[in-house]
Amino acid sequence: MAEMRPGPVVGKQLNEQPDHSPLVQPGLAELRRRAQEEGVPETPQPLTDAFLLRFLRARDFDLDLAWRLMKNYYKWRAECPELSADLHPRSILGLLKAGYHGVLRSRDPTGSRVLIYRISYWDPKVFTAYDVFRVSLITSELIVQEVETQRNGVKAIFDLEGWQISHAFQITPSVAKKIAAVVTDSFPLKVRGIHLINEPVIFHAVFSMIKPFLTEKIKGRIHLHGNNYKSSLLQHFPDILPLEYGGNESSMEDICQEWTNFIMKSEDYLSSISETIQ
């Protein structure tokens, strides 16, 4: 009988390998070669193994897809300096202190990080859509350093209670396109789910503006829970939701404060990657 030999380690199997594994080296070497050949800038972030692995893991080690994602990341940053060149958290500290955003302490059953955004804590007279988007980008740049998050991605909960016309006016077609670009194929994080709760009728006009820019895969991961959301939301996130959303975890106030503290402790790192890419 012929000896059974294991097949090559590919895709999701490679995703489970640690950064220093010899099995990931060929992919790293090829992605680095392409980046250097194309003249990808080594500032503000050098082409270290850890940095390159973000793109490889985000696309399950498909080199062509990882390379496309990497090019899109640099293209987006070059085209949106108003966001990418200003990741200093003090510019959005008021929004954070208001309780707009937090990251849950525990991951969901699939290992995804879970982010919560609360629209009622965004005062559109004080903060623009770009400020709100910057909060998300800052969090993304911090959690993408986590290997488990690179492997298992993120899920976001948007509590749209309090959404008003003044919020809607902030989301222009240009802003909608930039948001969609990051969600789909311009940032090295797997978006595993987008959950909307308390969505009012007037929000659907904005949603219709963003939707054409999204891929079919992302569209299929959007869940509209409405006002009676607690039972359906708990099915997706059992045991990890804060008290306000039907769970047994801490209050949103505590969760938001903890994440704000973490962002402020990361100020030096965020400043170091705040740079306009030519």
Curated annotation (Swiss-Prot):
A 1,2-diacyl-sn-glycero-3-phospho-(1D-myo-inositol-4,5-bisphosphate) binds at S208, M209, I210, K211. Its main location: cytoplasm. CDD domains: SEC14. Keywords: Cytoplasm, Lipid-binding, Transport. It is found in: Cytoplasm. Liver. It comes from the Eukaryota. One of its GO terms (biological process) is placenta development. The keyword DNA-binding does not apply. Coiled coil: none annotated. InterPro entries: CRAL-TRIO_dom, CRAL-TRIO_dom_sf, CRAL/TRIO_N_dom, CRAL/TRIO_N_dom_sf. PROSITE patterns: CRAL_TRIO. GO terms for cellular component: late endosome. (+)-alpha-tocopherol binds at F187. Residues 88-253 form the CRAL-TRIO domain. SMART domains: CRAL_TRIO_N (SM01100), SEC14 (SM00516). A 1,2-diacyl-sn-glycero-3-phospho-(1D-myo-inositol-3,4-bisphosphate) binds at D185, K190, V191, R192, K217, R221. The keyword Cytoplasm applies. Residues 1-22 are annotated as: Disordered. Monomer and homotetramer. Phosphatidylinositol 4,5-bisphosphate binding induces the formation of homotetramers. Phosphatidylinositol 3,4-bisphosphate is less efficient in inducing tetramerization. PANTHER family: ALPHA-TOCOPHEROL TRANSFER PROTEIN (PTHR10174:SF225), ALPHA-TOCOPHEROL TRANSFER PROTEIN-RELATED (PTHR10174). This is Alpha-tocopherol transfer protein. It comes from Rattus norvegicus.
